[in-house]
Swiss-Prot record:
It catalyses: Hydrolyzes free adenine bases from 7,8-dihydro-8-oxoguanine:adenine mismatched double-stranded DNA, leaving an apurinic site. GO terms for biological process: base-excision repair; mismatch repair. This is Adenine DNA glycosylase. Adenine glycosylase active on G-A mispairs. MutY also corrects error-prone DNA synthesis past GO lesions which are due to the oxidatively damaged form of guanine: 7,8-dihydro-8-oxoguanine (8-oxo-dGTP). Monomer. Its cofactor is [4Fe-4S] cluster. [4Fe-4S] cluster binds at residues 190, 197, 200, 206. The record marks 138 as: Transition state stabilizer. Belongs to the Nth/MutY family. SMART domains: ENDO3c, FES. The lineage of its organism: Bacteria, Pseudomonadati, Pseudomonadota, Gammaproteobacteria, Enterobacterales. Its EC number is 3.2.2.31.
Amino acid sequence: MTTLVFYQTILNWYHHFGRKTLPWQIKKNPYKTWISEIMLQQTQVKTVIPYYCKFIKRFPNIDTLSDSPLDSILNLWSGLGYYTRARNIYKTAKILKQKFNGIFPNSYAEIIKLPGIGKSTAGAILSFGFNLYSCILDGNIKRVLIRYYSININNKYIEKLLWKTIESITPIYHTNKFNQALIDIGALICLKSNPKCNICPLKSTCKSYLNNKLFQINCKKNKKHIIPKTKYWFLILQYKNYIFLEKRQNLGIWKKLFCFPQFIRQNDILSWIQKNNTKIKKINILNEFKHKLSHLTLYINPIWIIINKISIFSNNNKTIWYNLNNPQCIGLPTPVTKIITKIKKFNTHHE
């Protein structure tokens, strides 16, 4: 297949089958492209869509985003995971407001300097947001290239090789359609396992398909590593319709999110209660549950304590009494949200 035929084949497939109605593809602009690309990092499209729609409705532009508190951004991000992305969005919004007057720069050199934006994301912003020539190398495109050219994934220079490859085949014209087509072929056809080669527009010249190597090629090297496990005790302190939460600081997991007081040892909970002169009305020990992070597996043991009166007062920067009936706009980790939902259901059934 010649280079020209290769382009025409991909663009023709995109015309008939490519995705063109995703929320960030409608009335697209650099801001929408940026937000969607950050959300799509390590997260599937179907998961991102509802989060993206809520986010854009609340923060329709750079100004509204940069003028809002970080807590409101983390609130809409709650449940999406990888919260560093949200914190980087906030940092970038501030930079764009202060340095670029709220206008997204169309220079690769400027975009690549912004927090949380790497080479491929910068390329996506330029290609999809500005309709400029720029290469993209996300996980989907990597998979297509590795299979199409039958690239050895054990090559220690594979990243450089893939960039060199995509740079050599990305056309100057209709770059955005070409990029989106490769992404879609990777996402819809050239799957991690059980690729749908029978409907792939590139199968007639795909080296892996022709050499029957499809199931020997993965886009990631197989790395065997043991994910550490940690046990946490969560103290759920409730007074009427309020629950006590602490803001996590800059160390460890869930930075800047609000969480129940956490303990490594169960005995530390008693010490905490005594230290804060907490008057206990009732204690409920909830079932342990597992929560997986990318680098850690947590075994969470919630202890739910009903108290007679508040002995700890809110400090807006560090602690709050979370209103179950009228929740504050703050970021919450998924395990905290799950527990709060259970408590609200329990309270509703026992009113």
